[in-house]
A protein has these predicted regions:
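Non-catalytic interaction/Regulatory regions outside core domains
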Residues: 1-150
Length: 150
């Protein structure tokens, strides 16, 4: 199972990848970085993306409900299926990923589920012209699943 550096290197092989990082959304610190930063500083990017991730992870608006596909109820969607048809794990993050589209690119934030109480996500910055958003989401999901933390 690969560690942080290997996973970020793999993320950078995606078409259009400009930068990647693993960020702790409670502290806003980058745990690892690769490639470029949209603002020229990975720590600033980490702090700014952490604010967005924290909002999505903590606001009740984004919690799974009985009305969600799969009708499982409760935060984490225990027993339901994700957008890829695979079963969701009980207690997992209520938000799988966030996508922000800008004129020049895409920012994909993928929450990482761990065996301990973590609050980390992968951030991938893609060029809008050469990046493939669907492929990036699928590959980030796979990278997040095999990432070893701790």
């Amino acid at each position: 199972m690969p560690g942080i550096d290997e996973c970020l290197t793999e993320a950078m092989t995606l078409p259009g990848a400009r930068g990647a990082s693993l960020v702790d959304w409670t502290s806003g610190l980058a745990l690892g970085t690769a490639g470029e930063s949209p603002v020229g500083d990975h720590e600033t990017t980490a702090a700014e993306t952490a604010e967005l991730a924290r909002s999505a992870a903590e606001f009740d608006t984004f919690l799974a409900t009985d009305d969600d596909a799969g009708g499982t109820g409760g935060a984490g969607g225990a027993g339901g299926t994700g957008d890829d048809g695979r079963p969701e794990k009980a207690g997992g993050p209520p938000v799988e990923d966030l996508i922000v589209t800008t004129r020049a690119g895409y920012h994909v934030l993928r929450f990482v589920e761990t065996s301990f109480d973590s609050s980390v996500f992968l951030h991938l910055w893609l060029d809008r012209e050469t990046g493939n958003l669907a492929l990036a989401r699928m590959r980030l999901r796979d990278i997040a699943e095999k990432l070893v933390l701790g």
